[in-house]
Amino acid sequence: MIGFLKFALIGTVLLGVANGASVATASAKGSNCTVQDGYAALMCLVRLSDFAEKVDNLDMNDKTKLKEFKRSCDSLHSCYSNLNCTTKSDDEKDKYVESIKQYCDAVVYVSDGFSKCSDKLNEKKSKCFDDWDPIPNKIHLEEDEAKIEKIKNEACKTYFGKDDCMKKEITETCGKEEWDSFRKQFVNLSGGLVSKCDFSRFE
């Protein structure tokens, strides 16, 4: 499961925040940015690099590494929250900052809060759980924006597995409370992975 979370990070979080910070460093030469702003943006890029490395080396079973990852998350989130000079609008900046938080929360949840249920699903060799991947198929290979949006729209139908099988699997195996927590985490994360889906069918 951590595999697609890493892909989600690269595709929807890192590219966005890296662009925001790199623009800030370039813009520091302009009239709207100070040298201090440019330095702050560079620090964010350094923290982003550290964060990406921790994601790549993350061992979900190593509690020490998870704590380090969480600290890196908090540091990166704080850095971008306080970044003043960027050509991104406040709304765009807030979106990227929130995406960092959502991604980090999802990783911590999967590695800690959902681990027991995940073990149970693996033990019963759940086909739905094994096959589940909310990342739209081959979207990373597509460059046409219109086609990307179409793929994302289609992904809404299978975001929680074929015929929403993840709801049934998790509820039957781990209970409704676990499903509610799982649904909440991944609905929050969905904005960067797929189009704005209507998940009211789960309410």
Curated annotation (Swiss-Prot):
The keyword Signal applies. GO terms for cellular component: extracellular region. It is found in: Secreted. Keywords: Glycoprotein, Secreted, Signal. The keyword Nucleotide-binding does not apply. Glycans are attached at N32, N84, N188. Residues 1-20 form the signal peptide. It comes from the Eukaryota. Belongs to the UPF0376 family. This is Excretory canal abnormal exc-13. It comes from Caenorhabditis elegans. The lineage of its organism: Eukaryota, Metazoa, Ecdysozoa, Nematoda, Chromadorea. The gene is exc-13.
